[in-house]
Amino acid sequence: MNQQYLSQMLEGLATSLQLTGASLLVGCILSLLMTVTLILRLPVIHWFTRGLITLFTGTPLLVQIFLVYYGPGQFDWIRESFLWTWLSQPWFCAMLALALNTAAYSTLLFKGAFNAIPAGQWEACRALGMDKIATLKVLLPYALRRAVPAYSNEVILVFKGTSLASTITIMDLMGYAQRINGQTLSL
């Protein structure tokens, strides 16, 4: 492999890892908030969270990336607002789409881990007279420890999903690989 191509591939790998890290950070924060809203069953927010989960788990990631990148530009009020400085950037749009996607899947994962907490721990919290917030403070770390092995799969899926960012002009690992393949006509 030529040194020039190696440096391009390393640059693409750095972009893919940056997208993965930022998406996981934003997605994890969102998913923890969404999980808490599902657990506490806050009336309106609960159904809004359910709708987001259904939307982002029921559509392909490529469609989500296209909608986040090409969709907002169709509205004048978005193009004229401060949001356009962010939504016109391909990197931000790819990160946002990946973050929302991983937030939806991670929320289901964290909710499942929370539901797997043994009933005895719930009863112990009730016996001690804890309210919902205090119970969450005690049981949420336990649930998160149970969710870590499954969350590692989500990390891999997000990294794989970054290859779709090359469809909206981001030169990540896949983008550089396709360019090199097109220039040299070899793998």
Task: Set out the residue ranges of the language-model regions.
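Transmembrane alpha-helices and adjacent helix-loop boundaries
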Residues: 1-187
